[in-house]
């Protein structure tokens, strides 16, 4: 019998040997250690390195907790004010691990701090009774490196989600963008080789893992991300525009995301510049190589002579983002690389059609010709034609596309994501039990 503090600080006294054996006999996880080294799930999407992955980590944790599974998320502390532990919701903790200086570390510097981060993770686990976690789920390759160590130390399976791959990003670099370093490619290969199961967003991403990193197809699970249908839902366009102070009588194209070459916000401005009278709303903050020129997009708007037609907004809260999607005639997602594209899904959940690049997971998130338009390549004229086609659609066709967009997005709930995630966890535990512990048949 071992007594320790539970996730909420309450005493927890259990015969852990029995509990852990039950987990591996029943293939049911009770506690999950989630690793998100380079960005906190509590960070505002659209700032720094925060984006779809942050939303994914937080939403899956919340939904797992609602099913009685405790989740502890480990992320690197980025401010001295970050508390060591934050209770986000019943059953969900975020542990801010001190690993390196709080400020001034770029994501590409973080490999130098993985040892410090891993030490913090192991210390946290040591404060619990032995066998506290039943599974480790790492997000992004940096976390996978730490998850590899934790898996071996704790004797539990490692599930890994890459979110993006260096080789895929490097094959589709925007002009002026910097390639991912060889170090990352090596690190990703190691994690793919070591993980017990690999979770991908789409079948296309599964094929990439197999062709680039020679992943075993039998160890890959396709789990589509979801959308919060309570927040992102159709609304009154005029009311949404009034709330945001946007004109009621103009066509509006919205871009939402981090301001960096990878996301291609410049394509939206250049294409919209060819469409007289169209207003553009850009919501997001500079990130990655975009930090080198945080005002670059505003300067581009000035050079194109459309500054009066462009509204720049900082990263928005989820309710405000839903209002922006409701206000827009369409949302543009012209990324050069996108493993899925949650923004496209969230926009469609609000009944707003999407013009998206035909890359990565976007052909899954957007049904071409039904819920929006997929654009091959990044030719500005092609993008201008795509935007114009959606904006000039007859009212009945536009209304039908809006309904189809909302219906399509409704099939991607976080409950569905959690069902598939738990199925992957169960497979990981069952296989780990059989292959590594020699238990079962």
Swiss-Prot record:
Binding residues for UDP-N-acetyl-alpha-D-glucosamine: 44-45, 52, 258, 263, 316, 338, 346
Recorded coiled-coil stretches: none
Single GO term (MF): acetylglucosaminyltransferase activity
Residues that hold 1D-myo-inositol 3-phosphate according to the record: 38, 49-54, 107, 140, 164, 184
Pfam families: Glyco_trans_4_4 (PF13579), Glycos_transf_1 (PF00534)
Alphabetically ordered keywords of this record: Glycosyltransferase, Magnesium, Metal-binding, Transferase
UniProt superkingdom: Bacteria
Top EC group: transferase
Positions with a binding annotation for Mg(2+): 325-326, 328, 352
GO biological process terms on file: mycothiol biosynthetic process
Reactions accelerated catalytically: 1D-myo-inositol 3-phosphate + UDP-N-acetyl-alpha-D-glucosamine = 1D-myo-inositol 2-acetamido-2-deoxy-alpha-D-glucopyranoside 3-phosphate + UDP + H(+)
Enzyme Commission identifier(s): 2.4.1.250
NCBIfam families per UniProt: mycothiol_MshA
Function: Catalyzes the transfer of a N-acetyl-glucosamine moiety to 1D-myo-inositol 3-phosphate to produce 1D-myo-inositol 2-acetamido-2-deoxy-glucopyranoside 3-phosphate in the mycothiol biosynthesis pathway.
Family to which the UniProt record says this protein belongs: Belongs to the glycosyltransferase group 1 family. MshA subfamily.
Subunit structure: Homodimer.
Protein name, as recorded: D-inositol 3-phosphate glycosyltransferase
Source organism of the structure: Mycolicibacterium paratuberculosis (strain ATCC BAA-968 / K-10)
